[in-house]
């Protein structure tokens, strides 16, 4: 019969398994999760990766793994892009290196440039002329065809009007470029009414404060604008309301985000405010506010700051500058999530070292050493630095909490979705020594994000990104401990907007080092290469499975595919095929042997069969033909072949010993509850296949650190395997409280992987433990349908 295909979107809630309990649920191993029957017991729903002809499309009667057909769908374009991957990588490297001394790769703000253009010459002796004529020139060169100024790629009426009004006022102030002034004024006249229909979710920062000030300047210049337009009355009212809420003494007492919009305020005590300048000389990294302050004070540091800005941006200035911390952190985050960070290890390390130097005990700002910190940059820095082994304290979040609630900036008027999203991601990288603050932060952020999802309000006030709702849903549906690298990357390839994403400041702006089309193109090419290799490895693995007749031992082709997927979703680099296939083959063969031993367990004879298998494994000259147990003989043959295939020299003995230890965990009493031992077998196999284990084997035997890693991994995976069996109809005994126990142990594992100062165990080996544990977490967390959907998407659905 024709099977229906189920795929699982990341936004789907986790489903409860409802199929009838198996007569012997313990026979269903960690890998042998089947989707629910949809017609009658016995008919299994396989993922479309198996049944939709993908394999046939790839095989083309291949006899050798060295031949492959490129993915279908624009094959020529895909082949061209993958062949150009090395050039794309080098181009990105050059861009990252060129930005190493940058204070932020961002686009110019016409609004801020207009405020700079308004500054009167400081040494003019009373004569009126612009201090920055190059700002006037920039304005003249960058008018859009429709007469406006602003972001050319996206229309938000507040962005277009505030940029256009600022530029028209600047040109009119100096009486230059009359034709362009007229076109800009006409644009304002034709579009002012749109303000009444604008979406307040995407308001420009400080718009209700700064736009009326520009209108007042325009009125004083005699510009023909309907200042009584109904759309403006609401803005005037909001300005008065907001100004009334600003405590004047607090504004002058300490640095706050209000400094960013000083150009919209009057009657300021400049002597007090100038003490809050950033190290670069600005007021809260705002060129517009700094230009206004310069006009009022003539401060030399403000002048130098603005000169630096317009020199770096060809006469213009961004809406925020510097943004060096934000730029570096977000670019690293994007490269990691796109799955291509391994190409830029030295550049990323340099960026993170820079961020570490700028992280203070009370958090981080988006630019330099700006005194006003925010939870968004702090969370991103905390997460990335911890994941790269830096010593950072969770106490940095204490400064953003008040009465059980968290804020991005003190005194904010509304909460930011992305700030809470990034804080939620950061709160999951927990060490045992952390106080309860991270747990409290996680609970608060999750509740906030869940509420926003429930109301369908997944837009942010600081960025316009079509993929953001999907990003948030994925984070809520798949916690970090159950999110596999290739799954996250495959999903993020569809979420990442590249150059289409726009950020919201006083106007729209782009972050070219963060949102870059070349990143996306390179990531797609890299993932396509991964899929090509994966499909070949899958065909080879399936032939191995058939050749060894493992289906006769209860291993389904679906289990084989899932075993390979779990390995490939964690270890995906092309040069790590031996580790990836070693993981997959070991998991498959362990399932086959487990199935064989369970048959003997039913008769109380598992111990005897285990001894025979151990004896046969230990003897290289074992005479297969003398065994009356053909099943045992075929399994030993497959095991011997696996060892010969993946281990050489002394490593062969190490791999045999690993299997011996795993077999010894089987007893009549264990009834197959060997999830922890299977996890250790996988870790040892991966390490042996990589060549790392052999060179360090003796030292690892004496390492307390390594021993503790084994203990934690074994304990966690044993509990998770119990949970998986229960979900598949097994005993519910000892299941209660497993999640909490696993979470406690996960904290220690994370610390030992990312926060250990010991050199006994390499960082790659530590990561192997985490990869294996996360694969167990993933299977315990996901429904079979979700897993099948991920298999299809990661391995078989071409990247568009």
Swiss-Prot record:
Catalytic activity entry: (2E,6E,10E)-geranylgeranyl diphosphate = ent-copalyl diphosphate
Keywords from the UniProt entry: Isomerase, Magnesium, Metal-binding, Plant defense
An annotated Gene Ontology molecular function: ent-copalyl diphosphate synthase activity
SUPFAM superfamilies reported for this sequence: Terpenoid cyclases/Protein prenyltransferases (SSF48239), Terpenoid synthases (SSF48576)
Coiled coil: none
Ranges for region Disordered: 52-80
Gene3D superfamilies assigned to the protein according to its UniProt record, in alphabetical order: 1.50.10.160, Farnesyl Diphosphate Synthase, Terpene synthase, N-terminal domain
Inducing factors: By UV irradiation.
Positions that bind Mg(2+): 374, 376
Gene Ontology biological-process entries: defense response; gibberellin biosynthetic process
Any Pfam family the entry gives: Terpene_synth
Record has Zinc-finger as a keyword: no
Gene Ontology annotations for the cellular component aspect, listed alphabetically: chloroplast
Regions that span the bilayer: none
Entry annotated with the keyword Zinc: no
Biased composition (Basic and acidic residues): 55-69
Entry binding sites for substrate: 242, 461
Cofactor(s) the protein requires to work: Mg(2+)
Enzyme Commission (EC) number: 5.5.1.13
Short sequence motif named DXDD motif, residue ranges: 374-377
Family: Belongs to the terpene synthase family.
Other notes: 2 different ent-CDP synthases exist in rice, one being involved in gibberellin biosynthesis and the other in phytoalexins biosynthesis. Phytoalexins are diterpenoid secondary metabolites involved in the defense mechanism of the plant and produced in response to attack (by a pathogen, elicitor or UV irradiation).
Domain comment quoted from the record: The Asp-Xaa-Asp-Asp (DXDD) motif is important for the catalytic activity, presumably through binding to Mg(2+).
Role, per record: Catalyzes the conversion of geranylgeranyl diphosphate to the phytoalexin precursor ent-copalyl diphosphate.
Protein name, per record: Ent-copalyl diphosphate synthase 2
Organism: Oryza sativa subsp. indica
Gene that this sequence comes from: CPS2
């Amino acid at each position: 019969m024709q099977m229906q295909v189920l795929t699982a979107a990341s936004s789907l809630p986790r489903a409860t398994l409802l199929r009838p309990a198996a007569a012997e649920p313990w026979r269903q191993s960690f890998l042998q999760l089947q989707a629910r029957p949809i017609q009658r017991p016995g008919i299994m729903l396989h993922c479309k990766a198996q049944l939709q002809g993908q394999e046939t499309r790839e095989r083309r009667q291949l006899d050798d793994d060295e031949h492959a057909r490129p993915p279908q769908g624009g094959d020529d374009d895909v082949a061209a892009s993958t062949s150009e991957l090395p050039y794309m990588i080098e181009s990105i490297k050059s861009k990252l290196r060129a930005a190493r001394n940058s204070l932020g790769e961002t686009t110019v703000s016409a609004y801020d440039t207009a405020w700079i253009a308004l500054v009167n010459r400081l040494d003019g002796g009373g004569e009126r002329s612009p201090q920055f004529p190059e700002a006037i020139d920039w304005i003249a060169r960058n008018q859009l065809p429709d007469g406006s100024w602003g972001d050319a790629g996206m229309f938000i009426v507040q962005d277009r009007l505030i940029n256009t009004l600022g530029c028209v006022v600047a040109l009119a102030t100096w009486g230059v470029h009359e034709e362009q002034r007229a076109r800009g004024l006409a644009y304002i006249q034709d579009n002012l009414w749109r303000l009444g229909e604008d979406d307040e979710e995407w308001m420009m920062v400080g718009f209700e404060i700064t736009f009326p000030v520009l209108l007042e300047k325009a009125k004083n210049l005699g510009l023909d604008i309907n200042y009584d337009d109904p759309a403006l009355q609401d803005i005037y009212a909001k300005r008065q309301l907001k100004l009334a809420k600003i405590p004047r003494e607090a504004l002058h007492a300490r640095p706050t985000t209000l400094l960013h919009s000083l150009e919209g305020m009057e009657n300021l005590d400049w002597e007090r405010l100038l003490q809050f300048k950033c190290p670069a000389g600005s007021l809260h990294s705002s060129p517009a506010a700094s230009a206004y302050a310069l006009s009022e004070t003539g401060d030399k540091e403000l002048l130098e700051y603005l000169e630096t800005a317009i020199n770096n941006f060809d006469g213009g200035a961004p809406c925020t500058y510097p943004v060096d911390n934000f730029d570096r952190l977000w670019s690293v985050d994007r490269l990691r999530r796109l799955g291509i960070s391994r190409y830029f290890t030295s550049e990323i390390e340099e960026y993170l070292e820079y961020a570490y130097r700028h992280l203070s005990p009370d958090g981080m700002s988006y630019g330099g050493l700006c005194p006003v910190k925010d939870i968004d940059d702090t969370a991103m820095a905390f997460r990335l630095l911890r994941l790269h082994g830096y010593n950072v304290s969770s106490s940095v979040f204490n400064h953003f909490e008040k009465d059980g609630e968290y804020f991005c900036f003190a005194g904010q008027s509304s909460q930011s979705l992305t700030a809470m999203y990034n804080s939620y991601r950061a709160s999951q990288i927990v060490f045992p020594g952390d106080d309860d603050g991270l747990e409290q932060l996680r609970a608060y952020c999750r509740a906030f994000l869940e509420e926003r999802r429930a109301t369908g309000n997944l837009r942010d006030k600081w960025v316009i990104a079509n993929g953001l709702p999907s990003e948030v849903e994925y984070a809520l549906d798949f916690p970090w401990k159950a999110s596999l690298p290739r799954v996250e990357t495959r999903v993020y390839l569809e979420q990442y907007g590249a150059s289409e994403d726009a950020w919201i400041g006083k106007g729209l702006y782009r972050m070219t080092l963060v949102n870059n089309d070349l990143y996306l193109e390179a990531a797609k090419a890299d993932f396509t290469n991964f899929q090509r290799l994966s499909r070949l490895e899958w065909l080879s693995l399936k032939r191995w499975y058939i050749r060894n007749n493992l289906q006769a031992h209860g291993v389904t082709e679906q289990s084989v595919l899932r075993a390979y997927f779990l390995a490939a979703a964690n270890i995906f680099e092309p040069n790590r095929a031996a580790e990836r296939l070693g993981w997959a083959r070991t998991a498959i063969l362990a399932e086959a042997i487990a199935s064989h031993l369970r048959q003997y367990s039913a008769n109380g004879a598992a111990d005897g069969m285990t001894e025979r298998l151990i004896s046969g494994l230990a003897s290289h000259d074992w005479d297969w033909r003398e065994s009356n147990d053909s099943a045992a003989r075929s399994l030993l043959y497959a095991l011997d072949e696996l060892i010969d295939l993946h281990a050489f020299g002394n490593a062969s003995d190490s791999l045999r010993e690993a299997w011996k230890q795993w077999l010894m965990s089987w007893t009549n009493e264990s009834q197959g509850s060997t999830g922890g031992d299977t996890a250790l077998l996988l870790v040892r196999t991966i390490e042996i296949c990589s060549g790392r284990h052999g060179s360090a084997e003796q030292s690892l035997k004496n390492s307390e650190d390594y021993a503790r890693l084994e203990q934690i991994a074994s304990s966690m995976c044993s509990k998770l395997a119990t949970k998986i069996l229960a979900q598949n109809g097994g005993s519910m005994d000892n299941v209660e409280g497993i999640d909490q126990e696993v979470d406690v142990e996960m904290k220690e594992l994370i610390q030992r992987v990312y926060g250990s100062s010991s050199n006994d165990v390499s960082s790659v080996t530590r990561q192997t433990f985490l990869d294996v544990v996360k694969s167990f977490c993933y299977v315990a967390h996901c429904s079979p349908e979700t897993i099948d959907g991920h298999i299809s998407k990661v391995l078989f659905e071409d990247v568009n």
